UniProtKB/Swiss-Prot annotation:
Gene3D superfamilies: Translational regulator CsrA. A translational regulator that binds mRNA to regulate translation initiation and/or mRNA stability. Usually binds in the 5'-UTR at or near the Shine-Dalgarno sequence preventing ribosome-binding, thus repressing translation. Its main target seems to be the major flagellin gene, while its function is anatagonized by FliW. This is Translational regulator CsrA. Homodimer; the beta-strands of each monomer intercalate to form a hydrophobic core, while the alpha-helices form wings that extend away from the core. Keywords: Bacterial flagellum biogenesis, Cytoplasm, Repressor, RNA-binding, Translation regulation. Its main location: cytoplasm. Belongs to the CsrA/RsmA family.
Length: 71
């Protein structure tokens, strides 16, 4: 893991086209601004994990149900 220290209004770059800027520091919270191409998916980690879990649940289907659909 790379550790980088930034102050308010300072940025860091990921690759050539993703810029993350520290906008606000308050009460143990950090507000970040992310400038990235529109086709780049950006999710908070907790939302990413929830989506990943739902996708796993969707993969666990009863094959007998599928056999009934085939008729």
């Amino acid at each position: 893991m790379l550790i980088i220290t930034r102050k308010k209004d300072e940025s860091l770059m990921i690759g050539d086209n993703i810029e993350i800027t520290v906008l606000k520091l308050e009460d143990g919270s950090v507000k970040l601004g992310i400038n990235a191409p529109r086709e780049t998916t950006i999710l908070r980690k907790e939302l990413y994990e929830a989506v990943k879990q739902e996708n796993k649940k969707a993969m666990n289907i009863d094959m007998n149900l599928l056999k009934g659909l085939k008729k």
